[in-house]
A protein has these predicted regions:
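The canonical Cys-X-X-Cys-His
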Residues: 30-34, 77
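Short Fe-S-cluster ligation motifs
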Residues: 59-73
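Short active-site neighborhood of thiol/selenol oxidoreductases, capturing the structured segment around
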Residues: 13-28
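Extracytoplasmic/secreted envelope proteins and their assembly/folding machinery
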Residues: 37-40, 66, 96, 100
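Non-catalytic, surface beta->alpha helical segment in thiol-disulfide oxidoreductase systems
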Residues: 73, 78-104
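N-terminal "domain-start" segment that seeds a small globular fold
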Residues: 1-12
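Typically the conserved alpha-helix immediately C-terminal to a functionally engaged Cys/Sec
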Residues: 33-46
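Thiol-based oxidoreductase modules, predominantly thioredoxin-like and allied folds used
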Residues: 25, 48-62
């Protein structure tokens, strides 16, 4: 799994034009997760150099992602730099202004 994450999110290796990755772990059944949708949508619009991924924690196929990132509650956000290194983690709802501080 580590190699897969590095290949997908280390933009110095794969040449993709992103500076950051935001992985939003959540579920469509979770009220705080649904509140995060508008925050993530705002990041998508205002920060084109941020690669955004949503991982549905309710889907069994995503269990390996939850294990790898040690996700124990949702919503949870993981921000990685362009080398794929985790630089910020947050558990629960986070307002847009607070989240975008990590994309400087």
């Amino acid at each position: 799994m580590e190699d897969s994450v590095r290949l997908q999110f280390d933009y110095t290796l794969n040449g993709k034009p992103y500076d950051y990755t935001l992985i939003e772990f959540g579920s469509h059944y979770c009220v705080p997760c649904r509140l995060m949708e508008s925050v993530v949508d705002s990041v998508r619009v205002t920060r084109p150099k941020v690669n955004i991924r949503f991982v549905d924690a309710a889907k069994e196929a995503n269990a390996c992602w939850l294990d790898y990132f040690r996700i124990d509650i949702i919503p949870q956000q993981v921000v990685m730099d362009r080398r794929g290194k985790t630089i910020f983690r947050h558990r629960g709802y986070i307002p847009y202004k607070e989240l975008v501080e990590h994309f400087k």
